[in-house]
Amino acid sequence: MKKQLFLTLAVAGITATAIAEEARLLRFPATNSKDVVFAYGGDLYKVSLEGGQAQRLTSHIGYEMFPRFSPDGQSVAFTAQYDGNTEVYLMPAEGGQPVRLTYTATNSRDDLGDRMGPNNVTMAWTPDGKQILYRNRISDGFDGR
């Protein structure tokens, strides 16, 4: 009886740990009027606010994070680390080839474990949808272009 109780508790503990580990992989959600886009395990996914099966938007080598819908919901801006640098990218909200928007070459500041977070964090869009706001940590004369 004690052995069965121990095994039951052990299996329950392992299951709870696995669920908690998986939940920690889901990060940085952003919504528009009908969908939520989020990072999960380093890739971006989108799902209806009503629920359902999430659609994988990216599957690149490197991390994608901090997704933000455009005001019209047609595009997603996000931060990604593909070629060593952490840069801002843009792609259609339905998925597709990302377009790199920033070229800052800041390898020394792109440590994902840094307490300040990575460089070029996508923050928001302007209300008219013409510009993407992002946080950049360059302090040596970067002029915002």
Model feature map: region roles:
Residues A16-A20:
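Sec/Tat signal peptide C-region and signal peptidase I cleavage site
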Residues E21-V47:
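Beta-strand-rich domains and repeat architectures in extracellular enzymes and scaffolds
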Residues A30-S33, P67-S75, T122-Q131:
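Blade-terminus and WD-like Trp-Asp/Gly-His loop motifs, strongest in beta-propeller folds
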Residues A39-S75:
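N-terminal, post-signal-peptide region of Sec/Tat-exported proteins
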Residues F28, R56-L57, R100-L101:
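Conserved beta-strand positions that form and line the central face of beta-propeller blades
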Residues Q4-I14:
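Sec-dependent N-terminal signal peptides
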Residues E21, Y40-Y45, H60-E64, T79-Y89, ...:
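A flexible loop/linker signature enriched in serine peptidases of the S9 family
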